[in-house]
Amino acid sequence: MTIAQLTCESDTVANQEVLLSIITVVRNDAQRLLKTIDSLVEFYGDERFEHVVIDGKSSDQTLDLLQTNSRHKNFQYLSESDNGIYDGMNKGAGRASGQFLLFLNCGDRMAASPDQLDELLRPVAQTDEADIVCFCSRVYHGAHAGVLRPQSGRLHKMPTSHQAMVFSKEFMRTHLYDTRYRIAADFNLYLSANAARVLVLTGSEPLTDIEAVGVASENPWQSYKEYLQIAAEKLHGSTKWMALARIGCKAAAVILLKKTLPKGWLNALGRRA
């Protein structure tokens, strides 16, 4: 998918004032998708929001669930083969009509209410002060949860979880997820932004409830390999070398602790790379 295709697709969406498009990518995961859909009940029918689901041509009950949920006017889905998670996310961005985009993983849940989101995002939309807005998220390790607060000025890792980052539509018109990366394309996208236009809301309530287990935490070696490659390509000078050193040290620590820590703790380390 190209930038031109994304722009063209978004222009075909009905011209309406949608504040936030929530994008979910799924393939053969109906049970966890239902958790995400259930968390958005308050958002369905609210014209300030829309939910866009990109399905990778599922063969389970996912399509039945999507067809049932399509009764909501602000819900849409596309089911076709894709080239992985980030290709699906790019497709979702192309179909979205909101001023802001949130990529909510299948199985993760929205924690904020529609009015809370409106209160936080409306001023940003009116002032055009940010390309990326970073919120808190609540991370679940089984039955236990902890709040992950965003941090600014960190170039060796994500400022917060990807599911707690809201992107402006204008930013996504000119930046897509690089599908060369299987796990860390979100980190690549973050480093593509102007640091001065990344807004960090440290005092916010959690935007999303997310699972500690994910693609990155289940494949830490591939994750760190991609992080190192991206930092080497995107950063320069002393900033690059500091980032590479920190990523390398984190990777080494995970390797050493892999066989001694419970799986949930290792997943927590992998969540923030």
Predicted features and spans:
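Short beta-strand/loop segment that forms part of the nucleotide-sugar
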Residues: 48-57, 78-81
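A conserved acidic beta->alpha catalytic loop
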Residues: 55-64, 105-107
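Conserved donor NDP-sugar-binding/catalytic core segment of glycosyltransferases
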Residues: 109-147
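Cell-envelope/extracellular polymer assembly enzymes that use nucleotide-activated donors
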Residues: 18-21, 50, 188
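Conserved nucleotide-sugar donor-binding catalytic segment
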Residues: 135, 142-230
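Short aromatic/hydrophobic "clamp" motif used to bind/position activated sugar donors
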Residues: 101
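Short, acidic, metal-binding catalytic loop of nucleotide-sugar glycosyltransferases
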Residues: 38-48
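Glycine-rich, basic loop-to-helix element that forms the pyrophosphate-binding segment
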Residues: 78-96
